[in-house]
Amino acid sequence: MKDLVVVVPDSNTEQTLYGLLERHKALQIRRIEYRILVHPERDPGVLQRGASLLAEIDALNAFRYALLIFDREGCGKEMLTSSELEQQVQQQLDASGWQGRSAVVVIDPELESWVFATSPHVVDVFAGGDAEVFQRVVESFPKTPLGKPQKPMEAVKKLLRQKAIVRASALYKELASRVSLKGCIDPAFQRLCAILRSWFPQD
């Protein structure tokens, strides 16, 4: 039996998780065996049918824990808060036999909000090391209370366009493999780390 199965909405989230989960020491967890599934229906699919996807592969008997991750933006139920969405999906998981062995993390508004951590690696990966362009692009967007762009995906796309960098999933994995985890204060990211630490404490 493997430790963890994760259902995600797209390859960018998939590669971010690959980059993160290999850094077990930085996450303060033991090394784990895991599998990541990309739902073909993206965010709405994880929201509405993530538990069904786990049932299709008989994950209950193959993995100790299950984690569902998706963006609030684009999930189709943006009128609900992240907490309300997490509770809704958790009820589906509990009804499917995952009670006490599962969790849901909803990123608000979207994965790209994790990109804007306080780290020079962010500038290196998404702006080709050009701190001036990075700052100019970030300042061109309205900010959240945490000082991040309110539309992080648009900010990422604008950065990559200005530096002629192709937007690829490999960028997300590279950043997740390098960035200081302490620099990411996004609530969903902090929740993810806390869940992993509770399930897989260091030996």
Can you describe what each PLM-predicted range is?
Residues 1-3, 14-40, 50-203:
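C-terminal accessory helical subdomains adjacent to catalytic cores in phosphodiester-
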Residues 6:
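Conserved SAM-binding loop
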Residues 9-10:
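Helix N-cap/beta->alpha junction signal
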